[in-house]
Amino acid sequence: EFIDNAEVLHVHSGETRHYSTTESSRISVWSAKNAVSNQIIFTTYHSLHRIQESGIHVDTIYFDEAHNSVQKNFYQSTEYFSHHAERCYFFTATPKHSRTPSKAGMNWTKTYGQVICQVPAPKLVNQGYILPPKVEVYKTRILEKDELVADRDSEQMIDAIDNLKKNKVLICAKSTKQIVNLVSHTKFVSELAWRGYSYMLITSKTGAIIDGEKVTREEFFDVLNAWGQDPDKRFVVLHHSILSEGMNVKGLEAVLFMR
C-alpha cells in the first residue's frame, strides 16, 4: 500500500527543495491548509519544540538516533509527543539510561515505553549486517614552534590516507571550526587533489560543499550516493560528531577520527 497524496514539510534550518519553516505559526497554517492530505514532517531535535508550539495534532512520530532525545534541551518536547501522539517509536543503537530521577533516561517507561525489539551487536556482526571494524592507531606528534594545529591535522590525515590506500574515506572532526581550518587554511585540499581525491563536507554552519563549490543538500546526497556506488571514484567526506550519525555513506572503506 502506497500513500500518493502526502504533503511534505521540513522543520529545520537546512536547505531543501520542499517547503521549510521553523516558525510555529506557519507550521500551523501549513497543516490546516493540507488537512485533507496525509502530512509528513521532517524535523530535528533542535526544532522539535516548534512543532509542539504549533499545536498541530501528530498521529505517529519516529525518533531516530533516539539517545539524543534524553538531552535536557530536547526531553521536554520528547515527553510531550510521547504523551500526545497516538503512536511513538524510538530507534537507537546506543540507548542512554539514567539512575537518577533528576536526569532523563530511556529507561523511563512513562515516556519511552517498553522495549519492542533489541538485537545484540555481536549477533548483527555474526549474521553479516554489521562489519567488525579493524582499528589502526596512529601516534600524534607535538606541535612545533609557531605551527598551527590545522597544519598538523592536515599532515596526519594525508599520511593516514596514504597508509590506508582506500578510495572512500570519512573523516570525523570534533567541530565545524576544525573542518573549516583544515580545508581553508592548510594544503589538505591540494594534497587530496594531487592524489586524485575529491572532497565533500556538510555542516549546519557551512552548508553542503563539494570540491569547494556550495551545493544544495539534495545535490550533496545525490553525489554522495553516486560516488559511493562508483568503485573507481576517490573521495573524502568531512563531518563532525562521532561516526557522522545520520549519514549513510555507501561504499565507505575507512573512518579517520580527527581529535
Tell me the role of every PLM-derived stretch:
Residues 28-77, 239-241:
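Conserved RecA-like ASCE ATPase "motif II neighborhood" in helicase/translocase motors
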Residues 1, 11, 167-175, 202:
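Conserved RecA-like ASCE P-loop NTPase motor core of nucleic-acid helicases/translocases
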Residues 67-130:
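Post-DEXD/H (motif II) to motif III coupling segment of the RecA-like Helicase ATP-binding lobe
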Residues 1-26, 190-191:
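Conserved helix-turn-beta segment of the N-terminal RecA-like "Helicase ATP-binding" lobe
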Residues 56-62, 235-239, 245-259:
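A short beta-strand element within the Helicase C-terminal
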Residues 176-203:
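Conserved helicase motor "Helicase C" RecA-like lobe of SF1/SF2 P-loop NTPases
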Residues 113-180, 185:
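Conserved interdomain linker/interface between the two RecA-like ATPase lobes of SF2 helicase motors
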Residues 18-34, 196-243:
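Conserved helicase ATPase core of P-loop NTP-dependent helicases/translocases
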